[in-house]
Amino acid sequence: MSTRSGSAAELAIRGAHVVDPSSGLDGVTDVVVRGGRVAAVGRGRPAARELDASGLFLFPGFVDLHAHWRTPGREDEEDLESGSSAAAAGGFTGVVMMPNTDPVLDRPALVSGLVRRAERESRVRAFVAAALHAGLAGERLTEMRLLKEAGALCVSDDGLGTQSAGVLRNGMLYARSAGLPVILHCEDRTLATGAVHEGAAAALAGVPGTPASAEDVATAAALVLAAETGARVHITHVSTALSAALVGFFRGRAAVTADTTPHHTTLTDELVFALDGLFRVNPPLRPGSDREGVVGALRDGILDFVATDHAPHAPEEKELPLEEAAPGFLGHETAFAALYTGLVLEGRLSLGRLVEAMSCGPGRWVGGLGSLSPGSPADLALVDLGEEWTVSRRTLASRSSNSPYLGRRLRGRVVGTMVGGEMVYDRMGARLGVRT
């Protein structure tokens, strides 16, 4: 991320409805920013500059624990500038980049190089997840202590999953000794042989499916090993009701957290009937019964966070038959609106819980983010909850356009994003004024 020292002059953001569960804030007030940090919260504080945010909602900046910015290796699909621009447009102020790049982020020099590039090129705070094992091949563990020294926030097997329980157990033990959390993609590839969820929709559409057990078996194994090793483990993109229940069972038995995605909580496997490669994703979209179980687990805090699994793809990788298309969706720019429209407005999730899952919780996970309490980094998202908009290729800042929400009308749109006191995304027009 480029220099984010913020302006030395105080900026008062006036009249927004502030929602910050970490600080117990839920009401109209002012937030004063100075030197890149939150200086004060409360009405009537004087400041040299003012931002009229009346009618808007203000949240701690969203933090995404799971994204693919395709750097290095596939900058034609996404790079640090475009990925961070998409993140900023979606209200994200912090993003964790996954290691399944080309080359894989399995060596200290690659990690430190990407950390330095991100400091220069990213509009938001970008964190690096290094590979759990060399080449993400599931065999030889990486030098995790050296990866941590190079700047890795965590290690992960995302993209392929670790197929050997022995390797996974040893990896957890090593990660624990190195002081690194582990983000796990739970998938048994001996079961995951289809392109979509194995169920009634796949059968009717005539498309080979992958059973839910491909995720559930791997999730159960990961949780058992997490409890045994004491490693700090995060299960990503939970998509089945049983996997969510397993996470709940191990709460208190293991140092485990978990996330689900916007698409697994707002879409279902009925999209298979489109027979469109755009809708292929891994883990696959599930039936309504799984979606309801996952949404309930998110509502109840069993699933801690929402992460997007932002996965850009070139058109030629998605404009294929469903079975041949590359799996993955864009996520940054539509995440909040999809969840607000599909869950909050439908009465299935409170706004406060959504902010906790997108901002406060993942901000604590990465450390020191996700709060508007005085002294915290001035990372925030301003949102117009009343604005309706249609997702289109024209509205997307990403280099790619593989969003499952293309053509859908959503409500709630980010209009401003601040990182370290600096506006990195601004659709507010002439709301900024100077006091005399």
From Swiss-Prot:
<keyword id="KW-0665">Pyrimidine biosynthesis</keyword>
<feature type="binding site">
    <location>
        <begin position="68"/>
        <end position="70"/>
    </location>
    <ligand>
        <name>substrate</name>
    </ligand>
</feature>
<dbReference type="Pfam" id="PF01979">
    <property type="entry name" value="Amidohydro_1"/>
</dbReference>
<dbReference type="GO" id="GO:0008270">
    <property type="term" value="F:zinc ion binding"/>
</dbReference>
<feature type="binding site">
    <location>
        <position position="313"/>
    </location>
    <ligand>
        <name>substrate</name>
    </ligand>
</feature>
<feature type="binding site">
    <location>
        <position position="158"/>
    </location>
    <ligand>
        <name>Zn(2+) 1</name>
    </ligand>
</feature>
<feature type="binding site">
    <location>
        <begin position="327"/>
        <end position="328"/>
    </location>
    <ligand>
        <name>substrate</name>
    </ligand>
</feature>
<dbReference type="GO" id="GO:0006145">
    <property type="term" value="P:purine nucleobase catabolic process"/>
</dbReference>
<protein>
    <recommendedName>
        <fullName>Dihydroorotase</fullName>
        <ecNumber>3.5.2.3</ecNumber>
    </recommendedName>
</protein>
<comment type="similarity">
    <text>Belongs to the metallo-dependent hydrolases superfamily. DHOase family. Class I DHOase subfamily.</text>
</comment>
<feature type="active site">
    <location>
        <position position="309"/>
    </location>
</feature>
<dbReference type="GO" id="GO:0004151">
    <property type="term" value="F:dihydroorotase activity"/>
</dbReference>
<dbReference type="InterPro" id="IPR006680">
    <property type="entry name" value="Amidohydro-rel"/>
</dbReference>
<feature type="binding site">
    <location>
        <position position="185"/>
    </location>
    <ligand>
        <name>Zn(2+) 2</name>
    </ligand>
</feature>
<feature type="binding site">
    <location>
        <position position="100"/>
    </location>
    <ligand>
        <name>substrate</name>
    </ligand>
</feature>
<comment type="function">
    <text>Catalyzes the reversible cyclization of carbamoyl aspartate to dihydroorotate.</text>
</comment>
<feature type="binding site">
    <location>
        <position position="66"/>
    </location>
    <ligand>
        <name>Zn(2+) 1</name>
    </ligand>
</feature>
<dbReference type="InterPro" id="IPR002195">
    <property type="entry name" value="Dihydroorotase_CS"/>
</dbReference>
<dbReference type="GO" id="GO:0005737">
    <property type="term" value="C:cytoplasm"/>
</dbReference>
<dbReference type="GO" id="GO:0044205">
    <property type="term" value="P:'de novo' UMP biosynthetic process"/>
</dbReference>
<keyword id="KW-0862">Zinc</keyword>
<feature type="binding site">
    <location>
        <position position="237"/>
    </location>
    <ligand>
        <name>Zn(2+) 2</name>
    </ligand>
</feature>
<feature type="binding site">
    <location>
        <position position="309"/>
    </location>
    <ligand>
        <name>Zn(2+) 1</name>
    </ligand>
</feature>
<feature type="binding site">
    <location>
        <position position="158"/>
    </location>
    <ligand>
        <name>Zn(2+) 2</name>
    </ligand>
</feature>
<dbReference type="InterPro" id="IPR004722">
    <property type="entry name" value="DHOase"/>
</dbReference>
<feature type="binding site">
    <location>
        <position position="282"/>
    </location>
    <ligand>
        <name>substrate</name>
    </ligand>
</feature>
<dbReference type="GO" id="GO:0004038">
    <property type="term" value="F:allantoinase activity"/>
</dbReference>
<comment type="pathway">
    <text>Pyrimidine metabolism; UMP biosynthesis via de novo pathway; (S)-dihydroorotate from bicarbonate: step 3/3.</text>
</comment>
<dbReference type="InterPro" id="IPR032466">
    <property type="entry name" value="Metal_Hydrolase"/>
</dbReference>
<dbReference type="InterPro" id="IPR050138">
    <property type="entry name" value="DHOase/Allantoinase_Hydrolase"/>
</dbReference>
<feature type="binding site">
    <location>
        <position position="68"/>
    </location>
    <ligand>
        <name>Zn(2+) 1</name>
    </ligand>
</feature>
<keyword id="KW-0378">Hydrolase</keyword>
<dbReference type="InterPro" id="IPR011059">
    <property type="entry name" value="Metal-dep_hydrolase_composite"/>
</dbReference>
<keyword id="KW-0479">Metal-binding</keyword>
